[in-house]
């Protein structure tokens, strides 16, 4: 890890930061903050952080490579403005294990995705924990505001922090969720924003939750259900009836249900649900990508995908490479050819449209 008593940094190294997600209900996970102090028995993230932390003792000796601050409650927090790397130049993803860490260099990653995605913010942390400085959260929210093509999904066990920080609620792409694992957690939904997009994650489902006529279903836009995973001796496998009662009540209230793969052994493939709210089905694109993919029909002026139109090319002398100067939709291209007595060329795209 150390070279001459100091951790090496590599500004160009941006690996292991924003990944195509293995979490079924989102496209990407974005982890500008890692680490958590909830100490949940079933936490998968803690185990992952321990696997990819390197030698924490040596990492902490590289004091020039990170900053330290205290939370409002007095806990030690770490700040990385650049990724910490080992002697081979590879990023140490969690150099302080599961201790709360702000990876500031990861803040710009949503800008690198040109197509709109459903991004789970903070899969390796609870970014709304009481120990997380308000300034960290505001920096993350500011990035979300500046990159509105994505849907941002937040999940916490401390939803009252949503109200403490006055999160933006009048935007369709900001989704605020809370985790409910047992009957004692039900009250958490009361702290979700009064308006805006709200969801709950019942994962892991640890006991029977009274779902029938529960007012929570009047307030949420989506529900995710999953079972505890891993090999813990204390692992709880939910009963099928616990799951189906939640699903049935969600159906009665027209709340989309997403069931994670961990439920397949319990309910069976045929009973699995992969429902998404409408707002998470629509993919937006950046202005730069829009200009790359779309253009105006030269004749009728209708905007369409370039791939669905005929490219117009011209050259002034034989042997010159033709230059593209515009596009024309299939119908307009046919009319154009007829109008000028030009034989309509046999193009695959036009033949496919005729066959359809």
List PLM regions with ranges:
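Auxiliary Fe-S-binding modules of radical SAM enzymes
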Residues: 2-28, 52-55, 206, 210-294, ...
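Conserved Radical SAM active-site core
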Residues: 6-174, 183-194, 212-213, 217, ...
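Cys/His-coordinated zinc-binding microdomains
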Residues: 44, 301, 333
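Short Cys/His-rich "knuckle" micro-motifs
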Residues: 51-53, 307-310, 339-341
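Short recognition patches in nucleic-acid-associated and regulatory proteins
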Residues: 294-322
